[in-house]
Amino acid sequence: MVGTHMDESVDIVLVGAGVMSATLATLLHELEPDARIEIIERLDSTASESSFAWNNAGTGHAGLCELNYTPRADDGSISLDKAIHTNTLFEESKQFWSYLVEKGNLGDPGRFVHPVPHMSFVRGEDDVRFLRDRYHAMREHPCFEGMEYTEDRSVIGQWAPLLLDGREGDEPLAATRVATGTDVDFGALTRQLLARLEEKPDEQVRITTGQTVEDLTRNEDGSWRIKIAGNDDTQRTLNARFVFLGAGGASLHLLQKSGIPEGKGYAGFPVSGQWLRCDKPEIVSRHNAKVYSKAPIGAPPMSVPHLDTRNVDGSPSLLFGPFAGFTTKFLKTGSVMDLAKSVRSSNLSPMLSVARDNFSLVKYLIDQVRLSHEQRVDELRTFYPMAKNDDWRLEVAGQRVQVIKKDPQKGGILQFGTEVVAASDGSLAALLGASPGASTATSIMLNLVEQCFPEKFASQAWQQRLHDLVPARAETLADNGDLLRDVRRRTHDTLKLVDTQPSPEPVT
């Protein structure tokens, strides 16, 4: 890392040294190698907020196990749209990572992505019926080839022994399993990407840590003047023709300071997260899967419970959660004044509308905050009946600042997902929101590049380069099973992931 530099100009500034900025910086360097890029991070190390391994679940979201991605439609059918969309977006990420591994710009993929089966697990006749219908709908689509289904307790016990340990009674159970799921250490991925960028000659890409962007204003030529304060009380200014705000929850404040009209009306609803974590080898060794179930009735989408295998720094662990909470901080290392400081005349009405229409969410968060350790482990026992309090400890996860935006009908809505807000001239863009986030970082950043650099993006030179980086885009993969299989075969080989298994006979 480098020290301070006075009154400099660069081509591109990225605020925040997480997986989004690392992905965008890598893309832009591949597309425009001569561009001077600086990444500015408030903390003393990179990938220390939302991208840090234990601040997120590490799920390579691909629509394989997330039941809230496949709702039952009004006509009784299962809607696959979101699952297919998420699946093909993750294929774009795997293609990009594979390219970087093949070119030596990423090291051993086993340091950041691991093959972990993705499972869905349900109890009770109604949910078993739902999962069975879901399986029949999904198994016909190439995105979900290899999905297995069972209502046989002995098979579920083979797939995930902890689910059956000590489970009594004859309650109907069902599960699906896809062997090609993944666990991703987004912190390790981010650090690898940034380390390779820093190796570029002549400080073509520079990463500064321990520095905070305090303000940003327009220059007369349309570029941006960025005021930066160091943790050592130094001050400097930096000029850039393009700025990306990828600072997690802090992006909203910076978007507001930019003054671009496109940012008016946006607000944030911060939700904290917690996990139960187990590191005991005798327990961890008996579970190799990410097992997702259904959220309780009335609970928000980010509350879907799951029992996961995690691989962090070469050490396996188990994670269960998430348990939500409420704080007024926008970052795990932020200030309790973050929410209050984000209130503007332009977003007050949407915020009040969301507060009026989401009382059940507020109640849910309050109830979650009040949970004792015993009560959290009780929830875990719906997955792992033999769970003991002393085997699990609480791990505080990162902050998720959900997007609040204007709505012509309701006044304001709460949006669970990510959103890019960009200036009309493409000189500044901010990433707001949360899940599925990091899994689809490549797709989000490709769309951002197209939005902010439309002429260059459409040029023959950039299109050819983009085809090298991500040969098959999501919209193409969704409708071309042969192409999807070919792409997966290559990426899974490069990333050392297991091959897709043939789809079994359907269960009736």
UniProtKB/Swiss-Prot annotation:
It catalyses: (S)-malate + a quinone = a quinol + oxaloacetate. Pathway: Carbohydrate metabolism; tricarboxylic acid cycle; oxaloacetate from (S)-malate (quinone route): step 1/1. GO terms for molecular function: 2-hydroxyglutarate dehydrogenase activity; L-malate dehydrogenase (quinone) activity. Its cofactor is FAD. InterPro entries: FAD/NAD-bd_sf, MQO. The keyword RNA-binding does not apply. GO terms for biological process: tricarboxylic acid cycle. Gene3D superfamilies: D-Amino Acid Oxidase, subunit A, domain 2, FAD/NAD(P)-binding domain. It is an enzyme of class 1 (oxidoreductase). Keywords: FAD, Flavoprotein, Oxidoreductase, Tricarboxylic acid cycle. Its EC number is 1.1.5.4. Pfam families: Mqo. Belongs to the MQO family. This is Probable malate:quinone oxidoreductase. It comes from Chromohalobacter salexigens (strain ATCC BAA-138 / DSM 3043 / CIP 106854 / NCIMB 13768 / 1H11).
